[in-house]
């Protein structure tokens, strides 16, 4: 009853959001159809009051005054007694088809329903209306308070939900910030590791390049070593072959230098003088050593290897030594002489010639005689030979002849050097002739 008189001036929030309200006694309007305004509500209440008055008037016209006054507080009516003690039924108008008790119950119910709002007494109708209006105002105010309370509750619920959402979002933001910090630190670690890996890669690359370069150098050095070993082996074989083949040729070289006059004039003197024979023997050994040291033909294969001149090497091998060529050209007529035992005569003449040259060089001053370069070299060699004669044990202690120093590089000037050697030999021969004169 109080709910029907309240104003629904606001819409329900839950109904607007979800389209349905789960509250059974909702004081908010569910849509514009239920939304009422104060003017419409007052007119509707006034109209309802007018209809009620008309119904009361129509009802009072047909009923008794006692019925109109209501008998809920009145004592029950009893019939009067006659003299004999019987109850007398008074006349109550025309008989009605409805029993009296039923009619009384019906009236009672109707009067009770109407008395809830107003008093049917004539003098209290205005006061009851005022009280009804005051009660309606209180009910309206109470309903408005209820509306505000409901709205306040809804707002509190919304605030609580928003607060929960805020807390949840803040926790999520904190988790995300923590994850961001972790990822940032991880990225920094990876960048640092990447820098280290780059440095290591550059170091390994440089080391690999250096290793490859050094390995290439090692391979080249190994190839050079193999070529040098092969070259040295070839030179050793050539030198041993040349020394073995030139032992007999050196004697002929020393013998060809001596003239025929010296040979024929000194044979008897050499045969009768044992001291001179010993000196001549030592002179022969000195000359042999001199020839091995200064007149040995140097191999030219060393200078020609690697230049594509293998043909020159073969020609040098096939060509006879320069000393043999010179002796064959100079003394071809002398070799066709009348000597039968050429080796014996030449050996003795060589010994005598060396002995005489040594004596003549001692007795002659440096101002009276000009010494040539070849004779000076021979003189130095004689001094070395004399020291060997004085120390025979030292000479016997080293039976092997010391090898000459490595030959210089010989190219196109080899032939010119050989010509110079030939010229020196001719000059030496002339000097020998002058000494003999």
UniProtKB/Swiss-Prot annotation:
Phosphoserine modification, residue list: 259
The answer to whether UniProt assigns keyword Phosphoprotein to this entry is: yes
Q: Where are the zinc fingers (C3H1-type)?
A: 6-33
Tell me the keywords, alphabetical order: Coiled coil, DNA-binding, Metal-binding, Phosphoprotein, Zinc, Zinc-finger
Q: Where is the composition biased (Acidic residues)?
A: 333-343, 383-392
Keyword Glycoprotein listed: no
| A single GO molecular function term of this UniProt record | zinc ion binding
Spans annotated as Disordered:
35-107, 266-360, 380-437
Listed Basic and acidic residues bias regions: 48-85, 307-319, 426-437
Report the coiled-coil segments. Answer: 145-244
Q: What is this protein called?
A: Zinc finger CCCH domain-containing protein 40
């Amino acid at each position: 009853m109080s709910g029907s008189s309240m104003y629904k001036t606001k819409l329900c929030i839950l109904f607007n959001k979800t389209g349905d309200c789960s509250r059974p006694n909702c004081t908010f309007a569910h849509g514009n159809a239920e939304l009422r305004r104060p003017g419409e509500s007052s007119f509707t209440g006034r109209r309802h009051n007018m209809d009620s008055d008309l119904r009361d008037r129509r009802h009072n016209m047909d009923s008794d005054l006692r019925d109109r006054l209501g008998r809920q507080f009145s004592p029950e009516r009893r019939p009067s007694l006659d003299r004999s003690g019987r109850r007398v039924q008074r006349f109550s108008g025309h008989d009605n088809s409805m029993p009296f008790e039923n009619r009384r119950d019906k009236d009672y119910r109707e009067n009770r329903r109407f008395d809830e709002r107003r008093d049917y007494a004539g003098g209290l109708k205005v006061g009851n209306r005022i009280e009804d209006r005051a009660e309606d105002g209180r009910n309206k105010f109470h309903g408005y308070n209820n509306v505000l309370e409901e709205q306040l509750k809804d707002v509190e619920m919304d605030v609580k939900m928003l607060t929960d959402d805020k807390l949840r979002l803040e926790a999520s933001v904190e988790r995300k910030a923590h994850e961001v910090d972790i990822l940032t630190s991880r990225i920094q670690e990876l960048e640092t590791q990447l820098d280290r890996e780059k440095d290591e890669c550059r170091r390994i690359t440089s080391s690999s390049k250096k290793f490859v370069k050094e390995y290439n150098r090692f391979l080249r050095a190994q190839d050079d070593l193999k070529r040098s070993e092969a070259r040295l082996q070839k030179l050793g074989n050539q030198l041993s072959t040349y020394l073995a083949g030139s032992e007999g040729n050196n004697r002929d070289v020393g013998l060809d230098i001596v003239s025929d006059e010296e040979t024929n004039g000194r044979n008897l003197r050499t045969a009768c003088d044992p001291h001179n024979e010993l000196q001549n023997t030592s002179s022969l050994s000195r000359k042999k050593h001199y020839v091995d040291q200064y007149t040995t033909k140097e191999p030219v294969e060393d200078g020609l290897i690697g230049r594509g001149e293998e043909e020159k090497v073969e020609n040098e091998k096939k060509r006879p030594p320069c000393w043999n060529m010179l002796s064959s050209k100079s003394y071809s007529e002398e070799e066709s002489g009348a000597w039968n035992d050429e080796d014996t005569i030449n050996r003795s003449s060589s010994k005598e010639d060396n002995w005489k040259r040594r004596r003549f060089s001692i007795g002659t001053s440096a101002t009276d005689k000009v010494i040539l370069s070849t004779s000076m070299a021979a003189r130095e060699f004689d001094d070395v030979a004399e020291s060997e004669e004085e120390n025979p044990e030292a000479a016997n202690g080293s039976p092997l002849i010391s090898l000459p120093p490595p030959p210089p590089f010989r190219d196109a000037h080899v032939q010119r050097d050989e010509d110079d050697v030939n010229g020196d030999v001719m000059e030496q021969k002339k000097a020998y002739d002058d000494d003999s004169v």
